[in-house]
Amino acid sequence: MNLFDFFRASKKVSTASVAKERLQIIVAHERGQRSTPDYLPALQKELVEVIRKYVNIGSDDVHVALENQGSCSILELNITLPDR
């Protein structure tokens, strides 16, 4: 091993680390473009469970949406209740 090999080896980047870095960039980009947070499906499921304690509804009867307007976030909840 000569002196030049020593300096070249430190600059070598493994393909795994390059792939990992690229994947992290892609994931961050995808998360930034998503309009709904990760917790909305779980929130919708829990809301359906709570409402079912009092009213007979299906999981399709509850719609949850999150809307961003400037610096405010608005959580919209639409529940279709059955006729009495």
Swiss-Prot record:
* Coiled-coil intervals: none
List the keywords (alphabetical): Cell cycle, Cell division
Q: Key word Nucleotidyltransferase present in the record?
A: no
Pfam families, from UniProt? MinE
Membrane spanning stretches: none
Q: Name one GO biological process term.
A: cell division
| Alphabetical list of InterPro entries matching this protein | MinE (IPR005527), MinE_sf (IPR036707)
**NCBIfam families per record:** minE, PRK00296.1, PRK13989.1
Similarity section: Belongs to the MinE family.
Q: What does the function comment of this entry state? A: Prevents the cell division inhibition by proteins MinC and MinD at internal division sites while permitting inhibition at polar sites. This ensures cell division at the proper site by restricting the formation of a division septum at the midpoint of the long axis of the cell.
Return the protein name: Cell division topological specificity factor
UniProt organism field? Pseudomonas fluorescens (strain ATCC BAA-477 / NRRL B-23932 / Pf-5)
